[in-house]
Amino acid sequence: MDLLPKIDHKFDMIFADPPYFLSNDGLSIQNGKIVSVNKGKWDKYKDYDYVNDFNRKWLKEVREKMKDDATIWISGTMHNIFSIGQILTELNFKILNIITWQKSNPPPNFSCRYFTHSTEQIIWARKNEKTPHYFNYELMKQLNGDKQMKDVWQLPAIAPWEKSCTKHPTQKPLSVLTRLILASTKPDAWILDPFAGSSTTGIAANLANRRFLGIDQEQEYLEISKNRKIEIEDPKIATKYKHKLQGFNNQKELDLFLTKEPEPEYGSELIF
């Protein structure tokens, strides 16, 4: 986050996957194996005031880098989403939707003491209360079988072929990121991810002909990001990625996404 104030640029859209603060030494099941839920020191819960202070700080900094008509998407769970919603309102954002991402393949409930966690929430908000935002309503309708797209998205969690691209513990699926990028931006738009990780947001942005800047504190993940970008510069691999995306009802709808749009030019100083 120390880098963000130094960036002299305004963005059309932000996607943020901040710490959920759920690393509590618990256990889960992944690919049939018992695994720790701990993601790293950055995800450790301290106390409610710490979570609020953290979210307030990064949201203030990100807001300064948004165009007046820009929107922001923020993913979370019950561990952090209430704090984020409260602070968005406090900072005069306008909350537009709370998307419920219902995973079609969630991990099973290990403890059997409560309902299986199968959803994440994604808040969509615009920077200003009264400044209109962009929403590609017609495309979302087309991608949903010519029906209005609702705020519950049934999409799979990360697929094995995507997980092989990176070992980041909180990687998001391309299908989710592609949908929200197409919904809220036009081709050539600038997208920022302040918690980029291995830059799946950047991959989705570039596949959809948008421009991207990612920030992360881990050099290892920045190197992975650069390698992933180099990989999709091969048109054959980029097309392969697009065809593997899930969440389209039929081939006609997939073709809408595969339609060639104008290629943007990327600055050499940027990750994407």
Q: What is the predicted function of each stretch?
A:
Residues 1-224, 270-272:
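Core catalytic lobe of class I
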Residues 1-5, 226-268:
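S-adenosyl-L-methionine
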